[in-house]
Amino acid sequence: MRTYRDVIKVKDIILPYIEFTSTEFQLLLNRFSSLEVNAGSLKGSFKYNLSYKDVKTHFGLGGVHGAASKGVYESDDKMIIMSSDVTSFYPNLAIKNRWSPGHFPKDEFCDQYEWFFNERKKIPKSNPMNYVYKIILNSTFGLSNDEKSFFYDPELCLRITINGQLTLMMLYEQIMERIPGAIALLQNTDGVETMIPREHINLYMDICKDWEEKTNLNLEHDEYQKLVLADVNNYIGVNNYVDVDITKWREIKQSQPHYLFKVENDKFSFAPVKLKGRFDFHNLQLHKNKSKLVIPKAIYQYFVNDLLPEQYLDENKNILDYCIGG
């Protein structure tokens, strides 16, 4: 059970609602529409670089990636860093548009795919089963480009990844075109980070709502206090504080010690901290290299807690943080 194809004409698989207003993105759409891809070899089948609003964004089979210049970006009284991610982006593109491998009945495939998505929503992220369902959802897309898999259909793979990139860029373009003073920070496979004037937060949310209605997808929003940016794959994001009860506060402090915590006037709050790429050190998966963890920990302490590296190194007596694997 597999679907083999010869040539995929990309113009035939682009969603009808995809449209842009800027010259840069109209050229991108024209470029994608002109592609005819060898279905037997999708890897490296399309690459495109686009410069827009002083940020270079890269497109390819692996997704869309773009980042502003490296630096530390912080929210203040006038500006706020907004992060908006699409909920289970690639799986939901297939579910909402009723896409399936050519050899599967569409309704049965999409209904079962949606069942896994809905089951995952019922499980807290702290529960390992949430991660299991995440892998099931994401690997189903990935296996559509694996000839050894019974999900194999290169057109489905290309349909999801190209429409995913174009759809996300519609949101990115509208934010940048319609919000005066908006600053692009990150564009990744399933979301965008943008610094905008606080006075335009309602406009930002309206743009996101319009996008959700057009695409039938959902966005999850966060606000960052600070974004320490090296590149699109390596950064630290410090969210705003969230108030919780003392029981939840203690639970989160135990499971996520790298978050920020505070108690003021008997109010308990925490600020999630996202660690990506080489800055990550918390609960690394078994296949990840745990060598020299003292380095990302020292960087974290410096940028998040204003602790000088020499002071942190003097205080950190955990010998495992200094070990190097062979």
What are these regions (language model features)?
Residues 1-326:
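Conserved acidic
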